[in-house]
Amino acid sequence: MGDTYSLVLVAGYLSIFLFIGAIGYFYLSKPRIPSSNVNEQQQQQQQQQQQQQQPQINIEDEPQQRGGIGRMNLRNRRQPIINQRDEDTESSGSDSDNSTNSDNYDDDNGQEGEGEDIGVVAPGIVSNRSGKKIGKKKLEKLKLKDEKRKAREYQEYLREEKKKTDLEKEEALKEKRLEEKENEKLRKEEEERIRIEKERKEDEEYNLLKSQISLQESGITKNEDYDKSLLQLFIKYLKEHKICLLEDIAIEFNIKTNEVIDRIKTLDKQGLISGVIDDRGKFIYITKEEMEAVAKFVNKKGRVNIEQIALESNRLIDFSKKVVDNNDQDPVDTN
């Protein structure tokens, strides 16, 4: 029993010496820190030591109350703490040695480490999902990786949006082309319909004109006889009334006044009638004998004025109405 107690005691002292040696090795192997960051590193070390030494104080108080069994428990409880400190020492030393190699490794494996969750354990100390502590350089690299990942995601988002926009534009262009084709088709159909309608109307007009021409050709003889008889009535009316208003003649034959004047002039040129149209819109019919009598009076007197001609004309010309017999008329020349 005494030997066992001695072995436990020796093992406890050895554990303490190993712990002190590990701490010394940790501080000796730690790289030099610039003077500007000394205070910050000291504060971080003090906080880390306080967190690590807190369970040791509680554990060291237990042997005084529990005896040999307490020392065995103390050794068993210290062992994980020592192992954790050894791992921390190795990780801190490997961070500075592998900084150059990790740069190339990070560039070649851009996707690696993107999913790591980073959390702050203490000021200046960061841990990932696995619980391992991460140095400042590693943290900066992880942040850089995260920024690159976000940049890649943003570029991918832009590409997807551009692709989506291009597809929408292409669909809109297709719809526009289809609409233009449909409008062109409708326009051609409308033009064809208008052309057919126009041809139909032209055919109808042609057929109507053709039928009218046929009717006119069939009624030429009748129209010639009617015009001849109407012309004879016109001449008879002028001879009977002797003095006629042009408006009365137009009303009588259902024609315009201008047509009456033109017809009188035409008949005068043809020698069918003779007379004058005064400035008051009257036509005075004068026979050839009466005109010859007036001409003889002028030739006999030589120089005469208008009053003398008027007086002699009233004496020589008979202005009373006469009934003209159709048999006594001169033959009418329709040519």
Swiss-Prot record:
Transmembrane stretches, start-end: 7-27
MF-aspect GO terms: ubiquitin-like protein ligase binding
Family: Belongs to the DDRGK1 family.
Record keyword Transmembrane helix present: yes
Low complexity biased stretches: 41-56, 91-103
Biased composition (Acidic residues): 104-117
Chain segments carrying region Disordered: 37-124
Transmembrane keyword on record: yes
Protein name (record): DDRGK domain-containing protein 1
Organism: Dictyostelium discoideum (Social amoeba)
Keywords, ordered alphabetically: Endoplasmic reticulum, Membrane, Transmembrane, Transmembrane helix, Ubl conjugation pathway
Record Pfam families: DDRGK
Gene Ontology CC: endoplasmic reticulum membrane
